[in-house]
Amino acid sequence: MPALSRNTVLALIGATLVLHTTEEYLTVPAYLSSANRLLRLLPPPEFLQNPQRQRVALVMATVLPLAVIAWAILRPRKALLVSVLFLECILLINAGSHMFAAWVRGGYAPGVITAVMINLPFGVYVLRRAVKEQWIPSRTVWQLIGIALVLQIAAWAVSWLDKQSKMPR
């Protein structure tokens, strides 16, 4: 079986993003309406606690990266390729955060199925292939993963600090 072309791999990054955000889109409202330990520990920012706003944010978090992916396919440039691979790093780190959320919750958390079954293995495949085929150096992959991890931790910290600032003193 011939290897997938780079453009096909980039398009599949978009497809995995769509699958993942679709799972979240369909399951977040029930998740937000349920009382659970995770929401007490790391609540979403106030503006995302409304299911309608959450859905709008999920659509934007899908459409904008898809535009970058399409641009990278139609107008191949190194910066666009790195941007799409950074998106893949974000999806990979996000898979870890979904596993953490499911563990804290003691069960299902929105997005965990696609994160574990699709984004995690596909992310590893894409990044290994990017290094093997010299799309970008391994050092750059590790830097992108590090930046994605810092952004995830910062998002958690902002949510936690926002919650702390609203607690009665």
Question: Model segments located where?
Answer:
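Aromatic-anchored segments of alpha-helical transmembrane domains
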Residues: 21, 90-97, 149-156
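Terminal transmembrane helical module of multi-pass membrane proteins
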Residues: 125-169
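Hydrophobic alpha-helical membrane segments
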Residues: 89-98, 111-129
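Core segments of transmembrane alpha-helices
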Residues: 55-72, 91-94, 119
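Membrane-interfacial loop-to-transmembrane alpha-helix junctions, especially the N-terminal start
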Residues: 7-10, 79-87, 138-141
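N-terminal signal-anchor transmembrane alpha helix
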Residues: 3-26
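Cytosolic, membrane-interface loops and tails of multi-pass inner-membrane proteins
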Residues: 28-47
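Membrane-interface helix caps and helix-loop-helix hairpins in membrane proteins
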Residues: 77-78, 99-110
